[in-house]
Amino acid sequence: MEYFNVGKIVNTQGLQGEMRVLSVSDFAEERFKKGSQLALFDDKDQFVQEVTIVSHRKQKHFDIIKFKDMYHINAIEKYKGYTLKVSKANQGDLQEGEFYYHQIIGMAVYEKDRLIGYVKEILQPGANDVWVVKRQGKRDLLLPYIPPVVLSVDVPNKRVDVELMEGLDDED
């Protein structure tokens, strides 16, 4: 079965079985909602078990979650450093113009027919995502995912077409 990374358990939270998760999910509210099924992987990326979310809340930059049947710190402390993943079957359907991070990371970015670089990371600083584009011999380009900049995303061909607005590329 194919799994996709959605977060890392970085610590426990209190004594009642809550865990502090650093999310790398594209849809954290959906991914960590009550009843969601996730898979737990150890620090060697080996499958441990399926888990069900019974509670979720945001606190600062973390998602605080609790698993079904794990209601005390002693039951969850061993999971610090483990990774949470979602199975491909549990990903859900997307609307037009929505993409999973794993679909975007690695895509080639072009302006007209000139290769700019490849998407290496996606940041969520505020109102819109920012795609970090790794370029040959230049600093990374921060590309806001907004309509005037990102013209098209071709998932099957792993290609993004953009129009760089003035001031976006400080090395040109």
Swiss-Prot record:
Presence of keyword rRNA processing: yes
Compartment(s) where it occurs, according to its Swiss-Prot or TrEMBL record: Cytoplasm
Coiled-coil regions listed in the entry: none
Residues in PRC barrel domain copies: 96-168
Gene Ontology CC terms: cytoplasm; ribosome
Function: An accessory protein needed during the final step in the assembly of 30S ribosomal subunit, possibly for assembly of the head region. Essential for efficient processing of 16S rRNA. May be needed both before and after RbfA during the maturation of 16S rRNA. It has affinity for free ribosomal 30S subunits but not for 70S ribosomes.
Name of the molecule in the record: Ribosome maturation factor RimM
GN (gene name): rimM
